[in-house]
């Protein structure tokens, strides 16, 4: 429904809530002023805008390490007094904000107004160059691009993220609720998000070379490996007959001088004749 700007202004003057919060309250209540005030009080938004202009120089710097130690967050949240800084509700708020940052990969800035103009122009150039807009008329293209840029800027802004524990409110509304509850201005000043190994170019390790290096060996050169792989297999050697053992040496038979009329004595086969013995027939 359409909300009259005069009603929004009146509600703002009565509650001190922000213009957009007042408009949303009137939309939720159907334009009823009393119901809108009740809605703002239930959300903790009444009076938050007045406190938002006050200086917040106290606070805490807190950290959050996600399970597995792969994501870490540092965040600074300010309040007006050290009394509130020690309050358990304030500490819980800071811890919830740190967890929110850890869960949001795209978040880079606290709020949209902190995004540099060059980043906005870069996003605009990216959207204008997309092929699906090439055939659109110029005025239509501008509206589409503007809508996409606003969506993209909200993705970069922490305060515009839906709260991870209650998606019906944003982080900004969560902070405003605590401003109303604790009675002091609260401001998320800055944060840093760390991801293990982010920005490091990993090199593919040669597992064989790594093992060889640990063993103190030199890894085989690729050329040598290729040469060995290309070499034809050795031909099998034909079985050679076993060498016969050397024959037992046999002493030569002695030569016996015999007379002309003597008949030679028969020698036993395979045995040498007796050395130096000769007999004559009578």
Curated annotation (Swiss-Prot):
It is found in: Cytoplasm. Keywords: Cytoplasm, Elongation factor, Protein biosynthesis. The keyword Protein biosynthesis applies. The keyword Cytoplasm applies. Residues 81-84 are annotated as: Involved in Mg(2+) ion dislocation from EF-Tu. This is Elongation factor Ts. Associates with the EF-Tu.GDP complex and induces the exchange of GDP to GTP. It remains bound to the aminoacyl-tRNA.EF-Tu.GTP complex up to the GTP hydrolysis stage on the ribosome. Residues 218-282 are annotated as: Disordered. PANTHER family: ELONGATION FACTOR TS, POLYPROTEIN OF EF-TS, CHLOROPLASTIC. Its main location: cytoplasm. Belongs to the EF-Ts family. InterPro entries: EF-Ts_dimer_sf, Transl_elong_EFTs/EF1B, Transl_elong_EFTs/EF1B_dimer, Transl_elong_Ts_CS, UBA-like_sf. NCBIfam families: tsf (TIGR00116). GO terms for molecular function: translation elongation factor activity. GO terms for cellular component: cytoplasm. Residues 273-282 have a biased composition (Basic residues). Residues 218-270 have a biased composition (Low complexity). PROSITE patterns: EF_TS_1 (PS01126), EF_TS_2 (PS01127).
């Amino acid at each position: 429904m359409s909300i009259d700007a005069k009603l929004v202004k009146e509600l703002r003057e009565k509650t001190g809530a922000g213009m957009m919060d007042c408009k949303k309250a009137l939309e939720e209540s159907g334009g009823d002023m009393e119901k809108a005030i009740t809605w703002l009080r239930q959300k903790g938004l009444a009076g938050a805008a007045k406190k938002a202009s006050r200086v917040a120089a106290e606070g805490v710097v807190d950290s959050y390490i996600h399970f597995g130690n792969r994501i870490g967050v540092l965040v600074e949240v300010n309040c007006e007094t050290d009394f509130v800084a020690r309050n358990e509700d304030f500490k819980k708020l800071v811890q919830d904000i740190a967890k929110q940052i850890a869960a949001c990969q795209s978040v880079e800035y606290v709020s949209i107004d902190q995004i540099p103009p060059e980043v906005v122009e870069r996003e605009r150039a990216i959207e204008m160059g997309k092929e699906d807009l090439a055939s659109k008329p110029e005025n239509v293209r501008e509206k589409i691009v503007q809508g996409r840029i606003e969506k993209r800027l909200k993705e970069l802004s922490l305060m515009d993220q839906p709260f991870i524990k209650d998606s019906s409110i944003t982080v900004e509304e969560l902070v405003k609720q605590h401003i109303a509850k604790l009675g002091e201005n609260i401001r998320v000043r800055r944060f840093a998000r760390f991801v293990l190994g982010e920005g490091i170019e990993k090199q593919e390790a040669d597992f064989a070379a790594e093992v060889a290096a640990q063993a103190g060996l030199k890894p085989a050169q690729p050329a040598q490996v290729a040469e060995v792989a290309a070499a034809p297999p050795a031909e099998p050697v034909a079985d050679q007959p076993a060498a016969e053992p050397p024959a037992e040496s046999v002493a030569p038979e002695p030569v016996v001088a015999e007379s002309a009329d003597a008949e030679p004595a028969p020698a036993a086969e395979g045995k040498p004749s007796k050395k130096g013995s000769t007999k004559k027939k009578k």
